[in-house]
Amino acid sequence: MQRHRPLGQVPLSFSARHTARWRDEMDEQTRLKKLRWRCRRGMRELDQLFGRYLDQRWAQAPDAERAVFLQLLDCEDDKLWRWFMGYEACPDVANAALIADIRALPA
């Protein structure tokens, strides 16, 4: 019977340098998967907008912008919908700027 190694355990043949890089890549992949799951909303349109941001901007976004994006994910869907569609102005300036940037991303 073959024993499987636990998830996240590094094969012994990897050098220390490769091990650290592998772990960092795995951590980033795991974080991105969890973030993509958080982006799933009750509305397909919001799913598409947030997914577009993850695909096109997240990797190169500065930490401050990432923090604003995470703050947006904590907002209620109905508020997000009204802000993204322009029915209401977002009261937070940083959120409003990121919403405008996300709306401007190509489909």
From Swiss-Prot:
Its job: An FAD assembly protein, which accelerates covalent attachment of the cofactor into other proteins. Plays an essential role in the assembly of succinate dehydrogenase (SDH, respiratory complex II), an enzyme complex that is a component of both the tricarboxylic acid cycle and the electron transport chain, and which couples the oxidation of succinate to fumarate with the reduction of ubiquinone (coenzyme Q) to ubiquinol. Required for flavinylation (covalent attachment of FAD) of the flavoprotein subunit SdhA of SDH and other flavinylated proteins as well.
One GO-annotated biological process of the protein: succinate metabolic process
An annotated GO cellular component: cytoplasm
Top-rank lineage group of the source organism: Bacteria
Gene transcribed to yield this protein: sdhE
Keywords, sorted A to Z: Chaperone, Cytoplasm
InterPro entries noted in UniProt: SDH (IPR005631), SDH_sf (IPR036714), SdhE_FAD_assembly_factor (IPR050531)
Organism: Xanthomonas oryzae pv. oryzae (strain KACC10331 / KXO85)
Name of the protein in question: FAD assembly factor SdhE
Subcellular location: Cytoplasm
Family from the record: Belongs to the SdhE FAD assembly factor family.
